[in-house]
Regions:
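Bacterial N-terminal signal peptides that target proteins for export
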Residues: 1-13
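Compositionally biased, intrinsically disordered low-complexity segments enriched
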Residues: 9-11, 196, 750
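Serine-hydrolase catalytic core recognition
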Residues: 249-250, 310-314, 319, 325-327, ...
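Beta-propeller folds
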Residues: 16, 20, 28-484, 488-489, ...
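Intrinsic low-complexity/disordered segments
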Residues: 26-28, 745
Length: 782
């Protein structure tokens, strides 16, 4: 087994680091790495490091716990050659297979008359049924029930997977939304009961909003998301919203089809619209259907994507009160509201306002507030002092009682509260001196203030989740160069058992190299910014290499996502390095996990995109690494499509090639909360201009000097194709040569399609490296 050398750097990386000792003129005299062609075999070598191949060379690197009760959870474990299901009992300190995989494969093979292997069972998740057996749906949506005592399987049947339901606390009922109304189903008898009757189109109960980000995708696949709802602890009541999109204007998409195309329309509000979605809290009695409407005016809607989890609501232990939070349209205030579940009487508990956006988590959700079970206090996340921290407040008055945490570091996620011991558990970044400031750690602090205790001492990135009762913490820790280790910790931080020790030896033996971690100064010459470089193997002495910048500007997340181990990071860093590129990714100013000032650095100026920090860092790195600063390319998807096009148009003498996908090139055409939160409310001027003109890529299309490939999916119901077409039209008007690729009938999620990956490689090989790519190389995704 080949292991990374000291400091997490490979031998190749250490050799390159030696170049840092060379004087700047030595690098300046280097020759460009520019082969005449890149062969199909080199593409094949790069292909083996794409995520779907690289992950098969690892084992035990990911643990996503599915809790069965307060002590037990199961997870799907990827192993070499397949996968397995493992059951953990944290209280008993035991780890065992969730069932006998060989016997289950045999029973399923006999019942289905198809061959099944123990390490390749045809499901990724399961649930325990009332008799202690398991129920699962196969990848072709067949439902099976298997007795894991006698190992007999029955099925398949045509009962659809209930993705659209949320079970009550005891599992006896399930709530769902149908035809704009709220329903419950008795899970024992399947009897259904309608709770509301006055729902109407675009004004329904519990419905997933049509606006951003996949309404048309859901319709076409017949996927039904769960309702936006929260059961009371006693299972008697359901809190939900009535979501109003009645007068919101439509967007339209055309599905390519033989003969006439198919028109798809959906409600989608844009910045500056006079009417945007709103919602109002409603409470239903699950037995009688009696409804209580909160005595509180409708608030601005902001639910997006497939995740309809209601992060903004919490019930009291006695099920007599419910709290919810909401923001103003401009996001400059957050409000916590208390509602009496019997009468609907409502009151504002706290209103926090600011000059820019106010958040309850730098990553948007889940929200970092919690009302304590004692009914007299609540925890509130705030960046009021420049960093995101937790504060204890009086529930009756809303007044702050004390700081729970403080200092020049960030609370990331509130995980659990032990009210008896008066302790709160959370993850944070940037607190440990001498460590990578982006590595998450687990902490404990007193609700009454006075100190913070580190519970995860290993100098690594810790991905942590809590058990339902907060007694145990599942902690997977790793670095970019070391395999993950997963442990269960108790409230003292002590590891009570080891769950997994990841194995990445086959990946290393295949030639995989960890990226090089770097820090550099941002545009201001003062602020530290951090990123990674992926270096080509077997670099030639005296050569400088073209560099590709993988960009996602945030503000809600950056391009790197995690400083922990990942075999296939976003941006194809390892694969592109195999082709002879140095690949670069950086969390520039405007991305999260730092101070509020860092995060909001380009508020009101979304064209910034952090690109000046990319340029400053690349210029500095070119003095230390064999980077050809005259050959810089950039690519990205979604916000990265916007920012990569912005980069080549705003800095045309620095960025020579850009590949830009599904870009929100003008926030006036994107979901209203996005631009209004990060750029400000749209203001129209008497001369016909507005406050969003400055961020629109089509307005600077005439600046293009380099090579630009635009691409989009024609059924993108997240980032509408209209924005890319506006850029294309402006480029044509400016008589600029560019390339464009359309993915018919794809939604926003086509970035990992093999054809796009190959075309991206070809484009950079031809126009940035100056070489000839192999003709029509085919990348195969298993």
């Amino acid at each position: 087994m080949r292991r990374p050398s000291i400091y997490g750097l490979s031998p190749v990386a250490l050799a390159v680091l030696a170049l840092a000792t060379l004087p700047p003129d030595a690098l300046a005299q280097s020759r460009p790495y520019q082969p005449e062609s890149v062969s199909a075999s080199e593409y094949a070598r790069a292909e083996q490091f794409l995520p779907w191949h690289a992950e098969k060379l690892t084992s035990g690197v990911t643990v996503s716990p599915r809790w069965v009760d307060a002590n037990r959870f199961w997870y799907r474990n990827q192993v070499f050659g397949g996968h397995e299901f493992i059951m953990i009992d944290a209280a008993a300190r035991t780890r065992r297979p969730a069932f006998d995989h060989d016997r289950l494969a045999a029973a399923l093979s006999e019942a289905s008359d198809e061959s099944h292997e123990a390490t390749d069972l045809p499901f990724d998740e399961f649930e325990f049924n009332a008799s202690g057996g398991i129920r699962f749906w196969t990848d072709i949506d067949e439902r099976w029930d298997c007795d894991i005592g006698a190992y007999r399987c029955t099925g398949p049947d045509s009962v659809a997977r209930a993705t659209h339901e949320i079970d009550s606390p005891d599992g006896s009922l399930a709530v769902f939304s149908r035809d704009e109304n709220l329903w419950v189903r008795d899970t024992g008898t399947d009897e259904e009961r309608q709770l509301s009757t006055d729902g109407e189109p675009h004004w329904g109960y519990g419905v997933a909003p049509e606006g951003c980000c996949q309404e048309i995708s859901n319709r076409r696949t017949e996927f039904k998301p769960p309702p936006v709802a929260e059961w009371s602890p006693d299972g008697r009541r359901i809190a939900t919203h009535r979501y109003d999109e009645r007068d919101v204007e439509d967007l339209h998409l055309l599905e390519a089809a033989t003969g006439r195309p198919i028109l798809h329309s959906y409600r989608y509000a844009l910045p500056g619209d006079s009417i945007v979605p709103t919602w109002q809290l409603h409470l239903f009695d699950a037995e009688t259907g009696a409804r209580v409407r909160a005595d509180y005016d409708p608030v601005v809607g902001y639910f997006g994507g497939a995740d309809t989890t209601w992060h903004a609501a919490q019930w009291s232990p006695a099920s007599d009160r419910v709290w919810f939070s909401h923001h103003s349209r401009d996001f400059k205030s957050q409000t916590l509201v208390e509602v009496d579940a019997t009468t609907g009487a409502s009151r504002r508990v706290i209103v926090e306002s600011g000059d820019t956006w106010v958040e309850l988590n730098q990553l948007r959700t889940p929200y970092n507030w919690r009302v304590l079970d004692n009914g007299t206090e609540f925890i509130w996340f705030s960046e009021r002092e420049g960093w995101g921290h937790l504060y204890l407040h009086d529930l009756a008055t809303g007044e702050m009682k004390n700081r729970i945490t403080q200092g020049s570091w960030l609370v990331v996620q509130l995980l659990a509260v032990d009210e008896v011991a008066r302790q709160v558990y959370f993850t944070g970044v940037g607190r440990e001196s001498g460590r990578d400031p982006y590595r998450h750690h687990l902490y404990r602090a007193s609700l009454d203030g006075g100190g913070v205790t580190l519970l995860s001492p290993e100098d690594a990135h810790h991905a942590v989740s809590a058990s339902p009762d907060g007694r145990y913490f599942v902690d997977t820790y790793s670095t970019r160069s070391t395999a993950p280790v997963t442990v269960v910790r108790d409230g003292s931080g002590r590891p009570v058992m080891t769950v997994e020790e990841g194995d990445i030896s086959p990946l290393l033996e295949a030639g995989w190299e960890p990226p090089v971690r770097f820090s550099a100064k941002a545009r201001d010459g003062v602020t530290d910014v951090y990123g990674y470089l992926w270096l080509p193997p077997n670099m030639e002495e005296g050569a400088v290499y073209p560099v590709i910048d993988y960009v996602y500007p945030g503000p809600q997340i950056g391009p790197i996502r995690t400083p922990g181990f990942t075999s296939g990071p976003r941006g194809q860093g390892h694969a592109l390095a195999q082709l002879g590129f140095i690949t670069f990714a950086i969390d520039a100013m405007g991305t999260p996990y730092r101070s509020k000032a860092f995060h909001e650095s380009y508020y009101g100026n979304m064209r910034d995109n952090g690109i000046p920090d990319h340029i400053a860092a690349l210029k500095a790195l070119a003095l230390r690494y064999p980077i050809d600063i005259e050959r810089v390319g950039i690519f990205g998807h979604s916000g990265g499509g916007f920012s990569s096009t912005d980069a080549i148009l705003t800095f045309p003498d620095f960025f020579k090639v850009a590949v830009s996908g599904a870009g929100n090139h003008d926030q006036r055409g994107y979901h209203f909360p996005w631009g209004e939160k990060y750029h400000g409310l749209l203001e129209r001027n008497p001369d016909g201009t507005d406050s969003f003109d400055s961020q629109a890529n089509q307005n600077i299309a005439s600046n293009l000097k380099g090579k630009l490939l635009l691409h989009y999916g024609s059924l993108d119901d997240n980032v509408h194709p209209n924005m890319t077409l506006l850029v294309a039209d402006a480029l044509i008007e400016a008589n600029k040569t560019f390339d464009m690729l359309v993915f018919p009938n794809r939604n926003h999620g086509y970035a990992r399609e093999p054809y796009l990956i190959r075309r991206t490689w070809d484009y950079f090989i031809e126009h940035l490296m100056g070489a000839e790519p192999p003709v029509d190389y085919r990348i195969v995704q298993p």
